[in-house]
Regions:
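Rossmann-like AdoMet/SAM-dependent catalytic core
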Residues: 52, 103-186
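Conserved SAM-binding loop
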Residues: 1-113, 123-125, 139-141
Length: 186
């Protein structure tokens, strides 16, 4: 948030339900709120950009929150930027992750919530040069969002995931230096 504010000389507001994380952000000079309803109640105008970086997978109702952002927070020509872990690239489940996303399921969730995807990118930065660990999306509100969107189920998810993880493990053995990059100290 701070990097976006500095780079674009923009006003930013963060939402963080965790007291310790919110206090840390506030100590760095960021304007932070506790919840989405608090943000909606305090915001007189809509945002040009809403960023959800590693947030969506923690929400009990990701499509509902995406809809709420669409209808109550995002400007009509605004941008939604989000990133989630790629379900096909990770061996284990995170207990704090209430939802898992593949490229297909993320597209379906965004379509159901009334967004048009401008770009969907898979990447490994900053952890890997080889593996597509994360899904990054840039989207905008649809001009005519569907009123009764029927989700298209993804087929063969267990098989796709098993094959992706086997391929990842093989690549890691063949090229370990590019597979897992060291975490940079700050």
């Amino acid at each position: 948030l701070q990097a976006l504010q500095n780079e674009f000389q923009a006003e930013g507001v963060g939402v963080e339900p965790g007291d310790a994380y919110r206090a840390l952000a506030e100590a760095q000079g960021l304007h932070m709120l506790h919840s989405l309803p608090e943000l909606i109640a305090s915001r007189p105008q809509r945002f040009d950009l809403v960023s959800l970086m590693h947030v969506l997978e923690h929400l009990p109702d990701p499509v509902g929150v995406l809809r709420q952002i669409h209808t109550e927070l995002l400007a009509p020509q605004g941008w939604l930027l989000l990133e989630v872990p790629n379900f096909y690239a990770h061996n284990s489940y995170e207990l704090a992750h209430l939802s898992c996303f593949t490229p297909h399921t993320l597209q379906e969730a965004l379509s159901k919530a009334g967004y048009e995807i401008i770009s969907l990118r898979q990447h490994g930065y900053p952890r890997s040069e080889l593996f597509k660990l994360y899904l990054n999306v840039l989207a905008q509100p649809s001009i005519n969002p569907p009123t009764d969107y029927e989700v298209r189920p993804e087929r063969a998810v267990p098989l796709k995931r098993s094959l992706a993880i086997a391929w990842r493990d093989l690549r890691a053995r063949l090229d370990p230096k590019r597979s897992w990059l060291p975490v940079e100290e700050k």
